[in-house]
């Protein structure tokens, strides 16, 4: 059955069930349907797609809002002040579906259908003031924050406000606001008549791997309940995207996940290139793939070492950092930077590979397999490591999808879902590699999957080395490349266009587009809205870490605090990826 037939079947089922409540189908060129629903059908349609339809949509990949108040190009769309969007994925169909709801600031909740919608709706309330008809606390902003930052009326720069002065009264108010009462959160204070100890784990604790707090209810060493508290690392990157040029936002992508390097640049650029109709040359595609796999290895080495360290093995992390240094030397030689290269460009990459790159890469490929063999002996075959990880923090595929888990955390349950295979991009269909899978979905399997993924990344990099095509590293397109100098000297229109693009910025056609990749942590997705200007009207960044942390209260009750530390390490997150 073709993709069109698969998705047509789902659309027909929706139309048969909801009829006139489907207001319109938006033409976006996304490659998946975008449907506008009436408010009364919002929750019911989500429940139908998740629970009742054949080949359901069990994964709520993202849910976000758009402030439409200043948007000029939205012909054919229902009138809306705030638009609510949900992005659903059916693994069985290998298909996506986006639903939209026009609101006046109030929307039905789908948290009773998709458990992971809770944080997404709290974020939409926090950023846009959307009222979901239930109690919603701020998620990313401090509880004392005034206003909703992603509204177009909210300031974007500190200079738009009077200078900040921390008075004694303000300090006391901020301090009081940090107090979290478990009773107000509906968390029990007693167990079998005995009072639980409430412990603040973080936000400044080495085992939280960043500024992340978990409020714990403990009965001795046993975790009875856990309440994650995020937002301490929030920088407002989606707001920044609205005041940067399309090219100027690329360096900010590196900071969304500061260990991923160019990986976070790729989905953003795929979205922009889709909107502009830009075809990336084969050599640039393969350079992109090679660098993404290098950064996948760099991230997994850091995970591998710190995972072992968090269960008591001190040596591996030092060996693995030595190998990361070798990899970063290659990345520095190719991109000019180690961790934040800002190397990809709309239509390709910033520059061609340097002289001697192949010898450096070949040396690394010859070096690493033996090192990975040694790490397997040190870590995965260690009886102590296995005792601390096998059967601990286990969950199944259904639980993973319920909470929006993707990437190694999903594949550790045995679910074979990797966008590089299921929906190849950047030419991944040309490469021969396997998708490592686990069986139990426990801490050990999550570690094993990432260890095996490094071997597969080495295979992909070697194929890039041996099959790197000749040719351009950037598309010959007016939105990506300056025109020939000779044309500028003879044609005034060409000169004017070049001047405007260099000074004012690239103008991207009005519309919507989405870029998806299999990042080192899971599904990374950028959904962009252009209003026909030099800046994004709305950039929505779906990061895997955000979804993965929300799952903690489901998994950790019954664990000891020591096992909680191991479980947190096995998630493999960075708080910049969570808080954005």
From Swiss-Prot:
Region (NADH dehydrogenase I subunit D): 195-580
Subcellular location, record wording: Cell inner membrane
A GO MF label: NAD binding
Chemical reaction(s) catalysed: a quinone + NADH + 5 H(+)(in) = a quinol + NAD(+) + 4 H(+)(out)
Descriptive protein name: NADH-quinone oxidoreductase subunit C/D
Keywords: Cell inner membrane, Cell membrane, Membrane, Multifunctional enzyme, NAD, Quinone, Translocase, Transport, Ubiquinone
Family indicated by similarity: In the N-terminal section; belongs to the complex I 30 kDa subunit family. In the C-terminal section; belongs to the complex I 49 kDa subunit family.
Organism: Cereibacter sphaeroides (strain ATCC 17025 / ATH 2.4.3) (Rhodobacter sphaeroides)
GO cellular component, one term: NADH dehydrogenase complex
Free-text function comment from the UniProt entry: NDH-1 shuttles electrons from NADH, via FMN and iron-sulfur (Fe-S) centers, to quinones in the respiratory chain. The immediate electron acceptor for the enzyme in this species is believed to be ubiquinone. Couples the redox reaction to proton translocation (for every two electrons transferred, four hydrogen ions are translocated across the cytoplasmic membrane), and thus conserves the redox energy in a proton gradient.
Cross-referenced PROSITE patterns: COMPLEX1_49K (PS00535)
NCBIfam families, per database record: NuoD (TIGR01962), PRK06075.1 (NF004739), PRK11742.1 (NF008728)
Membrane topology, as annotated: Peripheral membrane protein
InterPro entries, alphabetized: NADH_DH_suCD (IPR023062), NADH_Q_OxRdtase_suD (IPR001135), NADH_quin_OxRdtase_su_C/D-like (IPR037232), NADH_UbQ_OxRdtase_30kDa_su (IPR001268), NADH_UbQ_OxRdtase_49kDa_CS (IPR014029), NDH1_su_D/H (IPR022885), NiFe-Hase_large (IPR029014)
TM segment ranges: none
Pfam families: Complex1_30kDa (PF00329), Complex1_49kDa (PF00346)
Residue span of region NADH dehydrogenase I subunit C: 1-171
Gene name tied to this protein: nuoC
Subunit composition and interactions: NDH-1 is composed of 13 different subunits. Subunits NuoB, CD, E, F, and G constitute the peripheral sector of the complex.
EC number(s) on file: 7.1.1.-
């Amino acid at each position: 059955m073709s993709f069109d037939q698969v998705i047509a079947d789902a659309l027909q089922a929706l139309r048969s069930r909801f009829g006139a409540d489907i207001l319109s189908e938006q033409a976006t060129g996304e490659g998946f349907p975008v449907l506008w629903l009436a408010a009364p059908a919002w929750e019911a349609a989500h429940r139908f797609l998740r629970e009742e339809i054949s080949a359901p949509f069990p994964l709520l990949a993202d849910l976000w809002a758009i402030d439409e108040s200043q948007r000029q190009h939205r012909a054919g769309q229902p009138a809306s002040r705030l638009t609510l969007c949900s992005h659903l994925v059916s693994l069985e169909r290998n298909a996506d579906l986006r639903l939209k709801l026009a609101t006046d600031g109030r929307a039905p909740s789908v948290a009773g259908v998709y458990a992971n919608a809770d944080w997404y709706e709290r974020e939409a309330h926090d950023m846009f003031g959307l009222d979901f008809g239930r109690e919603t606390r701020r998620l990313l902003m401090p509880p004392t924050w005034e206003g909703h930052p992603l509204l177009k009326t909210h300031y974007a720069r500190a200079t738009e406000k009077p200078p900040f002065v921390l008075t004694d009264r303000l300090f006391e108010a901020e301090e009081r606001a940090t107090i979290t009462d478990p009773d107000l959160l509906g968390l029990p204070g007693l167990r079998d008549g005995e009072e639980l100890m409430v412990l603040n784990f973080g936000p400044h604790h080495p085992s939280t791997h960043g500024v992340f707090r978990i409020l714990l209810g403990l009965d001795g060493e046993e975790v009875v309940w856990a309440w994650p508290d995020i937002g301490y690392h929030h920088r407002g990157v989606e707001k920044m995207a609205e005041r940067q040029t399309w090219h100027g936002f690329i360096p900010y992508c590196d900071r969304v996940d500061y260990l991923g390097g160019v990986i976070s640049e790729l989905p953003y650029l795929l979205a922009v290139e889709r909107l502009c109709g830009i075809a990336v040359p084969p050599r640039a595609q393969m350079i992109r793939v090679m660098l993404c796999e290098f950064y996948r290895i760099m991230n997994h080495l850091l995970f591998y070492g710190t995972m072992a360290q968090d269960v008591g093995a001190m040596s591996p992390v030092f060996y693995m950092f030595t190998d990361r240094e070798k990899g970063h030397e290659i990345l520095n030689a190719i991109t000019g930077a180690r961790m934040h290269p800002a190397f990809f460009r709309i239509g390709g990459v910033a520059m061609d590979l340097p002289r001697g790159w192949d010898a450096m890469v070949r040396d690394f490929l010859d070096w690493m397999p033996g090192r990975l063999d040694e790490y397997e002996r040190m870590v995965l075959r260690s009886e102590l490591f296995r005792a601390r990880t096998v059967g601990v923090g286990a969950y199944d595929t259904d639980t993973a999808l319920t909470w929006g888990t993707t990437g190694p955390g999903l594949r550790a349950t045995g679910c074979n879902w990797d966008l590089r295979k299921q929906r190849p991009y950047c030419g991944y269909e040309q490469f021969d590699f396997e998708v490592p899978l686990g069986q139990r979905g426990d801490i050990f399997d999550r570690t094993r999957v990432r260890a095996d993924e490094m071997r597969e990344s080495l295979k992909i990099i070697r194929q890039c080395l041996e099959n790197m095509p000749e040719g351009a590293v950037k598309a010959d397109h007016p939105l990506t490349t300056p025109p020939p100098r000779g044309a500028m000297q003879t044609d005034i229109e060409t000169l004017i266009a070049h001047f405007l693009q260099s000074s004012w910025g690239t103008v991207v056609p009005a519309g919507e587009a989405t870029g998806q990749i299999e990042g080192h942590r899971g599904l990374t997705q950028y959904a962009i809205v252009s209003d026909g200007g030099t800046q994004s009207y709305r950039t929505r960044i779906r990061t895997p870490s955000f979804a993965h942390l929300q799952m903690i209260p489901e998994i950790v009750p019954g664990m000891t605090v020591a096992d909680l530390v191991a479980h947190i390490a096995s998630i493999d997150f960075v708080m910049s990826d969570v808080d954005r």
